[in-house]
Amino acid sequence: MSLPHFDPSHYDAQLADKQARLSGLLAPFAAPEPEVFDSPREHYRLRAEFRLWREGEARHYAMFDPGDKRKPILLDDFPIASERINDLMPRLKAAWENAALGFKLFQVEFLTTLAGDALITLCYHRPLDTFWQTAAERLAAELGVSIVGRSRGQRLVVGRDYVEEELEVAGRRFRYRQPEGAFTQPNGVVCRKMLNWAHDVLGERDDDLLELYCGNGNFTLPLATRVRRVLATEISKTSVNAALTNLESNGVDNVTLVRLSAEELTQALNEVRPFRRLAGVDLKGYDFGSLFVDPPRAGMDPDTCELARRFGRILYISCNPETLAANIARLHDTHRVVRCALFDQFPYTHHMESGVLLERR
């Protein structure tokens, strides 16, 4: 993980630059000006990863400058991380003086939530034994966290291997299980704004929604309340299991979740070939009015873009505005951008999250 150049006095100017950049990318499509959703200036990041760096007999949390990956920047705190992470950092540093915990420890990962949950992953260049287990159990109790120990071919869990989050969308609180090692949105406050925007933009519908790349159900849960039924796809087994748990714990019963990639579902809808994982799913029985996509940085592949043309409405959340613009260019002859938004998930970096609603011309 690289260290962002943190300076709250520059935040507003950086956000304005991102807005101008997004507006410029979407200008060829006559898009409206983006709605802008800012971030807290500090303590916004709910997860963080640090290497450990030795200087003499002492070891420190370390990150690296994006311009020089070989030179560490030693840290005692991390202002962009959540207050919970900053509280845990010195207490964990004191604990790794215990040889059972500190011997050949080379990396530490923190995962926290707005709801107050926390999990620490400790990564080692050695096998973990019963002495480690005993020390980790004691530390977990002292810190009020779960701990996962990792070494090659080994993963030991003290407590739980997930955290629990609660996010309010349109007045309803949704509970999310977020597994260790799986993707979650790092900026919880901005994630909540994204969910509320998407819920508002989708609107109340009397037809069905197809969702690609659903992850742990982050968007699935609130969007399912706006439509008749949802067919959602995700390729990661860990994320699928978390999504199924999240659907059940929130009482959302109008979602069918299948473990397929977007490319595979496209083949299924085009009747290129059958998939065993779709056994019992009547694809032709759905009345899809909207498509929701939240693809990886590469955006939608050409076949998925062609699939998207079939939908009257496309709600697209993007972590890469360049591939978003490229995908819109493919769809521009059939769809127009009617709403767009900038979500500042990653302050003090050039990265941005954005969203658009496209409607058929």
Curated annotation (Swiss-Prot):
GO terms for cellular component: cytosol. The keyword Transferase applies. It is an enzyme of class 2 (transferase). GO terms for biological process: tRNA methylation. Keywords: Methyltransferase, S-adenosyl-L-methionine, Transferase, tRNA processing. S-adenosyl-L-methionine binds at residues 185, 213, 218, 234, 294. Its EC number is 2.1.1.-, 2.1.1.35. GO terms for molecular function: rRNA binding; tRNA (uracil(54)-C5)-methyltransferase activity, S-adenosyl methionine-dependent; tRNA binding. It catalyses: uridine(54) in tRNA + S-adenosyl-L-methionine = 5-methyluridine(54) in tRNA + S-adenosyl-L-homocysteine + H(+); uridine(341) in tmRNA + S-adenosyl-L-methionine = 5-methyluridine(341) in tmRNA + S-adenosyl-L-homocysteine + H(+). The active site is at 319 (nucleophile), 353 (proton acceptor). The keyword Lyase does not apply. Belongs to the class I-like SAM-binding methyltransferase superfamily. RNA M5U methyltransferase family. TrmA subfamily. Dual-specificity methyltransferase that catalyzes the formation of 5-methyluridine at position 54 (m5U54) in all tRNAs, and that of position 341 (m5U341) in tmRNA (transfer-mRNA). This is tRNA/tmRNA (uracil-C(5))-methyltransferase. It comes from Azotobacter vinelandii (strain DJ / ATCC BAA-1303). The lineage of its organism: Bacteria, Pseudomonadati, Pseudomonadota, Gammaproteobacteria, Pseudomonadales.
